[in-house]
Design a protein with these regions (language model features):
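Basic, flexible Lys/Arg- and Gly-enriched helix-loop patches that mediate nucleic-acid binding at interfaces
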Residues: 2-230
Length: 230
């Protein structure tokens, strides 16, 4: 059981002070009964809560996918730059959202308020793969493919085995199961190459939807979320 104002505010559409105002105006009902106090408690999973004429669909956590564009940093706040949270629709802004991991380039990013889920998809022990399209400034080579497979030795230690599939003269697909700082750029740097373009296109078995435009955000379905952790 939780306080009714906390339940409603947790869903992001209304702040806690706004909820209290709505309650004072008799705009909130629980199981058909008008609520007169914000301290009333209810079970968010079973109670029928109606706010301003709209039934509340309770979600303990939200999971958002973002097709991250350039020019936004993977942080909750930044004094100098725009953050990925600036792209989140207003209806989610009251939730304690954060980006699940860093993405310094473009592509698929997960934004959530579920800390345990974020930890699980980022933990190297879980072996959840991340797939990237990459373009470099020189020709791809079989030496790179072999080096990625054997494990590139970086300044902070040897990388786990990674996959590099050559798709063009200077393009390829990289699959990692760990996420070090600027890892792909540093790995190609060991072969004298500079990464020109880098886009994350897949996490686990979930691919970036082709209809999700750059900068757009939408919620995961439960089935899509399962694909991430497979």
């Amino acid at each position: 059981m939780e306080r009714i104002d906390k339940i409603i505010a947790s869903q992001g559409k209304y702040s806690r002070s706004e909820v209290k105002t709505l309650i004072s105006k008799k705009r909130v009902t629980v199981n058909g009964e008008v609520i007169k106090s914000s301290s009333i408690k209810a079970d968010p999973n079973t109670a029928c809560i109606v706010v301003n004429g709209e039934e509340l669909s309770f979600k303990k956590f939200v999971y958002l996918m973002l097709n991250k564009p350039k020019g936004y940093v993977s942080a909750t706040e930044d004094k100098n730059d725009k953050t990925v949270l600036d792209l989140v629709p207003l209806e989610y802004r009251h939730r304690n959202l954060f980006p699940a991991g860093r993405l310094d380039t473009t592509g698929l990013m997960i934004i959530t308020d579920d800390g345990e889920f974020a930890h699980n998809i980022l933990s190297p022990k879980k072996h959840i793969s991340k797939t990237y399209n990459v373009t470099i400034d020189i020709d791809m080579s079989n030496d790179m493919v072999l080096g990625f497979k054997e494990g590139v030795n970086l300044s902070d230690g040897e990388c786990k085995s990674a996959s590099l599939e050559i798709t063009g003269k200077n393009t390829g697909i990289v699959i990692l199961t760990e996420g070090r700082y600027h890892q792909i750029k540093r790995m190609f740097g060991c072969f004298g190459a500079k990464v020109v373009e880098l886009e994350r296109i897949k996490m686990g078995n979930f691919s970036l939807p082709s209809d999700l435009k750059m900068g757009e955000v939408r919620e995961f379905s439960s089935l899509e979320l399962e694909e991430v952790v497979k």
